[in-house]
């Protein structure tokens, strides 16, 4: 039997998610407030160990909606978590070069220097993993492998959760204002230390335009889903096992607020772009460039077969590159009961 929960910790990545909109609209707080549960932002905590749970999901009674790499790593490392939803919002995934580098297409990458971030102090370096994934997917389209390029690492000290959140006018940047910036490989590209790099999302298109970079390929627009599959495709909505076992109604309430936000987004494209711009610390223009003018229609959390297959393929990739200690069956990680409970409730109301 579900027991009342005092506090739910929530976190989401600075990317398009239904949870992010549900938080901004107050719907998560409303849904759980009716159960006597208050919500608290994990990312805004002054405690570094609490903020680190965004990556290792160590905090009990917490929900996370965002990039799948940390969630997969946590599961592979023994964290008792379950996925209750998957969302697939395609985004730009760019391999970029300087315009005078001579790199015009993927074939031209052979034998060239490719810059990779290297957060050696992080439990899971999701930035490195997603860059290698983007590179590998691009190269395989031309019969090439990652070994066909020269990898150049850009070491970054500390972890992703070291800095306390920095906020202006209610808008925060997760990770604070890190000395040296968040993309040392971009600096390396501009200095001529490497020939190409990988960036994705709203900031990728903004930086590419600002610095006049050449887009070698956008794997995020490829017609094959497994080529587009990366950290954000699909994204995972995950909770800890204790929350499911002890506070099942809370898990259902979380998912219900996410689906409510996504349904609202379908009918409110302009408002949705504004919310997504706030979520991604970007502007509405760059959100449209990165996630499409139909970004409001891409917010769909479910458990469809395409997403499950892509998540398994991505998990296998992470194991092959030793980003996770062991592989596992994604289907065993998924708990469909909260989604089934919501659908059953809708059917009863309709009947």
Predicted regions and their residues:
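Short, low-complexity disordered leader/linker segments with a strong preference
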Residues: 1-6, 348-351
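Short, glycine-/small- and polar/acidic-enriched structural segments
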Residues: 4-147, 151-155, 162
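Short, solvent-exposed loop/beta-turn-alpha elements that line the ligand-binding surface or hinge
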Residues: 30-33, 223-227, 298-306
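Short, surface-exposed acidic
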Residues: 34-42, 143-151, 280-292, 324-332
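Pocket-lining segment of extracytoplasmic ligand-binding domains
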Residues: 69, 160-276
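Short beta-strand->loop
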Residues: 82-89, 150-154, 212-231, 329
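Secondary-structure end/capping motifs
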Residues: 247-323
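Conserved C-terminal helix/tail region of periplasmic/extracytoplasmic solute-binding proteins
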Residues: 318-351
């Amino acid at each position: 039997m579900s027991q009342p929960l005092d506090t739910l910790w929530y976190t989401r990545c600075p990317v398009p998610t239904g949870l992010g909109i549900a938080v901004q609209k107050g719907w998560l707080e409303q849904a759980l407030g009716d159960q006597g549960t208050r919500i608290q932002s994990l990312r805004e905590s002054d405690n570094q160990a609490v903020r680190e749970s965004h990556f290792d999901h160590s905090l009990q009674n917490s929900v996370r909606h965002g990039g799948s790499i940390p969630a997969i790593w946590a599961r592979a490392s023994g964290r008792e978590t379950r996925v209750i939803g998957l969302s697939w919002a395609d985004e730009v995934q760019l391999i970029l070069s300087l315009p005078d580098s001579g790199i015009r297409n993927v074939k031209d990458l052979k034998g060239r220097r490719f810059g990779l971030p290297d957060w050696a102090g992080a439990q899971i370096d999701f930035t490195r993993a997603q860059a290698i994934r983007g590179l590998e997917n691009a190269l395989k389209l031309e019969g090439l492998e990652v070994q066909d390029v020269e990898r150049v690492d850009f070491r970054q000290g500390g972890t992703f959760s070291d800095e306390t959140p920095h906020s202006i006018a209610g808008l925060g940047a997760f990770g604070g204002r890190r000395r040296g910036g968040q993309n040392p490989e971009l600096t390396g590209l501009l200095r001529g230390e490497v020939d190409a790099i990988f960036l994705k999302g709203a900031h990728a298109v903004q930086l590419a335009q600002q610095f006049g970079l050449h887009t070698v390929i956008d794997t995020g627009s490829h017609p094959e889903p497994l080529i587009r599959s990366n950290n954000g495709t699909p994204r995972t909505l995950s909770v800890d096992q204790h929350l499911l076992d002890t506070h099942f109604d809370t898990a259902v309430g979380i998912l219900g607020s996410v689906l409510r936000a996504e349904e609202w987004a379908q009918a409110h494209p302009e408002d949705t772009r504004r919310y997504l711009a706030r979520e991604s610390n970007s502007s509405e223009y760059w959100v449209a460039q990165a996630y499409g003018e139909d970004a409001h229609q891409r917010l769909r959390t479910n458990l469809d077969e395409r997403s499950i297959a892509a998540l398994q393929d991505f998990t296998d990739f992470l194991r092959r590159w030793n980003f996770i200690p062991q592989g596992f069956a994604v289907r065993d990680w998924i708990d469909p009961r909260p989604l089934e409970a919501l659908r059953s409730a809708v059917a009863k109301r309709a009947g």
